[in-house]
């Protein structure tokens, strides 16, 4: 789960990741490396308790993690000042992501590798006056005045994660699948 609080001067990203140890691995894991760059760590918890970790320039080592656990991380990032156009950045007043090949590590601490597949639920919080359209991967689950929640049920590597927030127009059509299911299609563009 990812929760973005988009702001003009900073963005707070909260992540909640459920880890399960591979049953074919029999030895205890002493440390787990999570990629992370250009992140200001606010908090990190394992199963609701302060985590033991070692911060590095390119990520952090989670020390002595349990076999199965829930990791909650909160970071501060600055998309408004990013010029490399990786991770979450701003362009023409809109928030955009570029996660391929290794940009997701500039959004939160994560196993930023193509062989790690995850299901993403993304909550985007923003001022709708400035960012009326809030998009992410998958299906729109819920939308309120200042929030949109998206769920993508298809497991995928984090380099395929996408988020866009801003003033956009769209063209819309629908498609009927061979099973008779109606699918809405939209193409978003700057006005």
Where are these regions (language model features)?
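Acidic/His-enriched low-complexity segments
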Residues: 1-191
